[in-house]
């Protein structure tokens, strides 16, 4: 397993769009990828719509794969919180994608709202946010106060999904 930071970006973004099922992402786009032993994508975190105070984050993973690790978690949050030093990241998820909503909630994202009819097909978009200080306090964060702690994915946060 190998983490790529920005290499194969175009290929990674195209793969993530196919997995997530979305066409466009606004602004400059970059990606951090996790590859299997054959060099194929296991997971990709795509970043878009950087404003100086926020960046959108999209996470795509190969279905039925075991890809989430502390190292990929920290690699994914390194760009927004340690390099760009934005105060927040935003996760945008289709309303019907309950698995993704549960997943980001477990990562510590907070539900922030619903954009009705945000997609061309009339579908709603759910907004989730994670603040820099929430990431730094996260049990998996590579932060001097939490380094060395572990927690299973299911215990990271609640499974609450908003209406």
PLM-predicted stretches and their roles:
Residues 118-163:
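C-terminal "cap" of GNAT-fold acetyltransferases
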Residues 68-76:
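Conserved acetyl-CoA pyrophosphate-binding loop and the N-cap/start of the following alpha-helix
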Residues 96-113:
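Conserved active-site alpha-helix within GNAT-family acetyltransferase domains
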Residues 92, 110-125:
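Conserved catalytic-core motifs of GNAT/GCN5-like acyltransferases
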Residues 58-68, 94:
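A short, internal acetyl-CoA/4′-phosphopantetheine-binding micro-motif in the GNAT/acyltransferase core
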Residues 48-59, 85-87, 124:
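A conserved beta-turn-beta hairpin within the catalytic core of GNAT-like acetyltransferases
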Residues 82-93:
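Conserved GNAT acetyl-CoA-binding A-motif
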Residues 6-54, 63-64:
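Acetyl-CoA-dependent GNAT
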